[in-house]
Amino acid sequence: MKSSLALALLVGGAIASGPQQQVLREPVDHPQAAETPLQKISDIFGHLSEQAGNVWEDVMDKFPDTLMDAITQTPPPKKHNRRPDSEWDHIVRGSDVQAVWVEGDAGEKHRKVGGRLDTYDLRVKAVDPSNLGVDTVKQYSGYLDDNENDKHLFYWFFESRNDPKNDPVVLWLNGGPGCSSLTGLFLELGPSSITKQLKVEYNEFSWNSNASVIFLDQPVNVGYSYSSSSVSNTQAAAKDVYALLTLFFEQFPEYSRQDFHIAGESYAGHYIPVFASEIMSHSHRNINLKSILVGNGLTDPLSQYPHYRPMACGEGGYPAVLSSSSCQAMDNALPRCLAMIQACYNTESRWSCVPASIYCNNALIGPYQRSGMNPYDVRSKCEGGSLCYTQLDDISKYLNRNAVMESLGAEVSSYESCNMDINRNFLFQGDWMQPYMRVVPTLLAQMPVLIYAGDADFICNWLGNKAWTEALEYPGHNEFAAAEMKNLTSQNHEDVRVIGQVKSAGNFTFMRLFGGGHMVPMDQPEASLEFFNRWLGGEWSDKSP
């Protein structure tokens, strides 16, 4: 699940706290503050240019106190209790894997797998399917440990229900940044969901119907993962994910021979292109990466942010949520927002990217948040707290049960679905507005890329995702931009059922899924499993030599 709106609006939500607050307040004089806040900003972010200083002064005039509190807040370490090595079925030492050298075809010696692995270990527990009843298939859970930096990432693997010896392997990532991928497991595409009575309920449309799936809690301090340190940008998280996959496939080489895909949603629109690039940067690897899939993602803010106003104001296929005056205010704010995002793109520095996040989220997402409607589904009101889904409370209660934590080998004292501290860290590192779509052209030269979007989502809406795919500069740009949106028809029924629209050219595919919100597998489980299986089967990949 994405970023909660509190996430997306760390400032637009936490700072724009009241429903009556204007999108941006008029500047207020704070004579006692003088220049001290800006000096503190300079201490944190480094030297500010005159232009950047002016932007920060303006932003801090509008959010004088809570902004500094958010920037300087240091969260306490997550409580945990590490289990002894004797409780694990397998431990893979990264130093052992790194030490293996092999001989190439030309007689040259090289490491079997690239990348720095010596600080990492992988702990593996064989999960007894009968204990929890989530699925009957073979399962593993455990931790990737970065011993040098005291980081511990939790994962849960489910083998395919169909033909695990031949079916592909998929890594699933929820977004946030700071939301657990166990949300995806129990709310969207995993083998079971959790009822209000905290019972597991079988999901016939689970994505492990024809693929083995790894659910990963990342970055650290998300879900069951923990650390005394932190990760606050996508590039740093990519190193951890590469290490986890490398050690996992070293322990289970039978899965490394299968095709491998990375899928996720929301802020995974940042994660996935960078994680895939990290994997492909190693010429010697045991990860057979074949494609990536991003659902309702945030990848190119400059192309996507102009579509918040149309989606909220009745131009995305659903009735308007906001009043005409709110829509006009969003239009008025857009030019400045885009100028700030462009400045971030030009420098890729914190001092440009952080103000863009603060201003744009407040001006273009804030009005929708204050409407009380669900940012993940324009058809419904927000219920159950800032994340808008009461089911998340049931999932958290289930995953906080001692019996569940014991069965999985979890080492934290408690589970929470989203960690707002992680979100804040990423935002104030400037990661939110970074132009990560710039790595996609290189990926398109290597593998198929699917961008799909449920068309009822606001926060990462289909209009914006279609726009950035059509704007992407790469050799196939003209062909893809000119490609026709065609009906996506289900092949699982005798009668004709149109489940969405799709356009595809070369290795690039965009898909609009009808009736799906931010979490397509939750809203349209049968349709999502169908397009997923068809994608893994290569239906839209480039067949040219």
From Swiss-Prot:
Enzyme class of the recorded protein, top EC level: hydrolase
The EC number(s) this enzyme carries: 3.4.16.5
InterPro entries in UniProt: AB_hydrolase_fold, Peptidase_S10, Propeptide_carboxypepY, Ser_caboxypep_ser_AS
Annotated GO biological process: proteolysis
Cysteine-cysteine disulfides: C179-C418, C313-C327, C337-C360, C344-C353, C382-C388
Gene3D superfamilies, alphabetized: 1.10.287.410, alpha/beta hydrolase
Stated role: Vacuolar carboxypeptidase involved in degradation of small peptides. Digests preferentially peptides containing an aliphatic or hydrophobic residue in P1' position, as well as methionine, leucine or phenylalanine in P1 position of ester substrate.
Protein name as annotated: Carboxypeptidase Y homolog A
